[in-house]
């Protein structure tokens, strides 16, 4: 579903991404982990078509994000760790604005907005202006907007930052149901025990290079993901 082939990205003389290659398969939850500055956000924004890259190719469901960006983005949703929302809009207006861009039918959007707003406990706040919300509330609005158009590919950068424990639990259930229904999830996180329990596969990035990628159970062996990660980082 997501194919990353020999992708490199330069910032001046520094390689933020260095010949990165791996595949995220349809119907799996894939974790992308690494220290701050390792290249996680750079790759995520490149996959989403937000950031250009210098070498290589990224395919979404067989289509190039460079050559067919609209076709790719139609089946994707992206949630950042610090969502940039239209602060002066009401939450419901922003969510409907996103649904309009994806041509979501009225019946589908109403059902999904109600479902996720109730799940995240903000159904009574949808009429409020976004600028009055806390970071966690804004994160919930971004998640509802992303989920309401039922994307085939959900890409998230630190999606659990700012969420309360119930919202984290609910989000994990959403992720499981999404892949059960044929969707694909690719996300970065620093919460390694959660990635260990939730994900099918994982890639570990260090200084812009992939140092380990594969099945979560095989990479872990009889160790915790945290221990494996720290051992690889120490090399």
Language-model features: where?
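Walker A (P-loop) phosphate-binding loop of ABC-type ATPase nucleotide-binding domains
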Residues: 35-39
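Conserved ABC transporter NBD signature motif
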Residues: 56-67, 71-72
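Conserved ABC ATPase "signature" region
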Residues: 96, 100, 107-125
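Conserved ABC ATPase signature
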Residues: 129-136
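A short, proline-enriched helix->beta-strand linker immediately N-terminal to the Walker B motif
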Residues: 148-152
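Catalytic Walker B motif of ABC-type/P-loop ATPase nucleotide-binding domains
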Residues: 154-158
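ABC ATPase "signature
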Residues: 213-214
